[in-house]
Amino acid sequence: MTAADWRRTLNPQEQREVRELVGAATEFDAVAPVGEQVLRELGHDRTEHLLIRGSVSGGAADAVVGYLNLTPPRDAQPQMAELVVHPRARRRGIGSALARAALAKTGAANRFWAHGTLEPARATAAALGLSPVRELMQMRRSLRDLPDSVPAVPGVRIRTYAGLADDAELLRVNNAAFAYHPEQGGWTDVELAERRAEPWFDPAGLFLAFGDDDSDRPGRLLGFHWTKVHLDQPGLGEVYVVGVDPCAQGRGLGQALTAVGIEWLARRLGAGDSAADPTVMLYVEADNVAAVRTYQRLGFTTYSVDTAYAVPPAAN
């Protein structure tokens, strides 16, 4: 790659080729090379795209063999890059070329996600002088043998999502709970609408906890648990997002909401069927010790780790 051809938009053919590239890498590595938000951005002009075309061993001579997505600057958060190289076009320096292009564009200020922290990603990071700066753990547990009862929280009632009328409170709590978070914080109606449009969205799997006693304003949202059923992976559910208003923390609300959602996923995915073996997954920041311990108490164990790499501050 002699010059980086950054693009704000991709045409439908290019979007299709990138999705096929991601699918090929996912099948080969048994882990998706980019997050779901990258795929969501393919049809928009909110991020920047970088494509590398070339030959695929035993395949097309002019295929998209490398792709990188770069988020725009946002508040004080570093830009994030995610990239993928076709399994049959690796060991040609494509990944390094994409990464160097991103570093050149951002003045070496961006980060790179390495999903699954696979050996090729670790080797590329080392060759570029990048160091781990953030770890995101994926934890899983079986949906069998769940606790018999969900812990109740006094003065709180939990119901499912009732539609657009819930959105203002949902956004308020989400943005208060994740004010620090580079991906989950700062949501608007756009982010909610995009997720409602996803094939997996089910209002019956979005649980909202409201204050229902004198200590809280009735009707005020205290927390929520958004679950997800992975339609492309039968038997897999996800604790997609659990958010609790900082004013309501310390009451066991997060654990109660998590348990309610997991119980629903177990019913939804047929945990009572002797032939089924459903599983629930979640993501948690590795340095969030309290949350990790909470999930461990709920029976979750570490399944994989995603690592964000960056140029060390002294070298930047």
UniProtKB/Swiss-Prot annotation:
Enzymatic class: transferase
GO BP, sorted A to Z: mycothiol biosynthetic process
The keyword Hydrolase appears for this protein: no
Residue positions binding 1D-myo-inositol 2-(L-cysteinylamino)-2-deoxy-alpha-D-glucopyranoside: 36, 183, 228, 238, 283
EC numbers: 2.3.1.189
SUPFAM superfamilies reported in the protein's UniProt record: Acyl-CoA N-acyltransferases (Nat)
Swiss-Prot/TrEMBL keywords: Acyltransferase, Repeat, Transferase
Keyword Cell inner membrane included in the entry's annotation: no
Boundaries of every N-acetyltransferase domain copy: 16-153, 156-316
Catalytic activity: 1D-myo-inositol 2-(L-cysteinylamino)-2-deoxy-alpha-D-glucopyranoside + acetyl-CoA = mycothiol + CoA + H(+)
Binding site for acetyl-CoA 2: 242-244, 249-255, 288-293
GO MF, one example: protein-N-terminal-alanine acetyltransferase activity
InterPro entries: Acyl_CoA_acyltransferase, GNAT_dom, MshD_Acetyltransferase, Mycothiol_AcTrfase
Binding-site positions, acetyl-CoA 1: 83-85, 91-96
Oligomer and partners: Monomer.
Family the UniProt entry places it in: Belongs to the acetyltransferase family. MshD subfamily.
Function: Catalyzes the transfer of acetyl from acetyl-CoA to desacetylmycothiol (Cys-GlcN-Ins) to form mycothiol.
Protein name per its UniProtKB record: Mycothiol acetyltransferase
Organism (species): Mycobacterium avium (strain 104)
